[in-house]
Structures are given as C-alpha cells and as structure tokens.
C-alpha cells in the first residue's frame, strides 16, 4: 500500500500541475468579465465560461437578426457560433451603456461576422467609446471575408476619474458608452460584446484564418520589396493603343494647303497676261 501511495502521490501532483492552469484560466477569465451581451440573441455561456446575457436593447433600439443562423461561422468554436450568427443593427447610430465602478485596466471585446453582404464597401461604420473613435471605417467583409468571425479588441484605462483609450483622455463619470456609428454604407451592427478587467493579452484568440494569414504575408512581402517592384512593373508596362497624333503637325499641313493652291492659280494667270 505504501508503494502505491508513493507512486500515485507524485503522479497526482503532475496531473494537477498540467491540468490546473487550464482549468484556472477558464474560470479565471469568466471571473474577469463584468458585462457581456449576445446582441440580437438569447443568453449563452461560451467555452471559456463567459455568460452572455440576452440583449437588453430588445424592443427598444434597432432590430435583431438571426439571418446568420443558416451559416457556419469560420474561426469560431462550434459551440460559440451563435455569438456571431445573431446580431443587432440599426438604421442610425446606436450603442450600449455599461456602468463601471472600479478603476483599473479593462478590455472591450466586440464580435462581428458579415453574413449578408458578399463584397467590400457594402457595410462600413465607425465605433466610438465615450466619444473617442476607436475603430474607423470598419468593413467586416474587407477584413476577413464572408461568414467569418472577427473580433475588435480595445484596451482602455480608468484612473483618477479619467478614461484613456488609444492615446486620448477624457473625463470618466462611471459609465462606459460603446457606440456603433452610422456611415455612408448600410447600417452599423454588432454580434456580441463583453467588458473584462485585464489586458489584451488576456483575451482568447480566434482560430487561425489561413486565407487571412496568406494575405498578410503577401502584403508584408510587398512592403519589403518596396520601390524596386514598382519600377519593374512600370518597366514591363505595355502601352494600350497607338500613339496620339501630333496636333501641331496637322495644323502645319492645313496651313500649307491654301498657299499651294494660291500659288498654282497665280502662275497660269501670270503666263496668260505675259502673252497679251
């Protein structure tokens, strides 16, 4: 019996060491979240233990849509696709007000997926936090494509009655206002959002997007190549169509024609006069 305990003791310690951090991370993350909403949908508990409440704007502002329920959402856990399949939109700007009593470091996590439009420049809008524009011209399809999860992560700091976000500072009176601002292209929207204490490093990352990573790598390669590639493309450029005729050459020919005609008439006339 003693030998079994001697073996199981260290084994249990190893298991707790390996499993412990994962269990603690899940429960710890949920404890850090102070406010979460499934916009346009019902309450939901995600794989991290975050409890999203039913949309408090239901019947008050904007419209709820579950159009995305018929589509699978890339980059999202299968259990949490509902967070990207429902949404709230409005024909004008709208938002959520979140009371915050304690000072400290916070993170706003906004969840989106484009489930309707299939090209860029169809739905574009801004996002403001207490009047500060934190996301400009958000085009979800342009960022990640169709029916694909996209998160906007916005760190903020509240200290000594001041809100700091992206280098801007304003007076904070205990209420955080997250606003989705109407633009020129369609209506602003959001699928889900939550506020948590901590930093951006504490936010769970979405699953990899192979197409998006390839696009970013190509953009980085183009930036590294710089001007030589542009020079080469200019060098290999083919002219489209024939050269444009010189307008001044045509003007000279048109001026010479009357002179030649006059000269041709003058010579025979002079010859006839001489014979007389």
UniProtKB/Swiss-Prot annotation:
Cytoplasmic side: 275-276
Binding residues annotated for a carbohydrate, in chain numbering: 67, 89, 116-117, 186
Membrane topology: Single-pass type I membrane protein
Gene Ontology MF terms: carbohydrate binding
Transmembrane spans: 254-274
Family to which this protein belongs: Belongs to the malectin family.
PANTHER family, alphabetized: MALECTIN, PTHR13460
Protein name per its UniProtKB record: Malectin-B
Native species: Xenopus laevis (African clawed frog)
Lineage: Eukaryota, Metazoa, Chordata, Craniata, Vertebrata
Record gene name: mlec-b
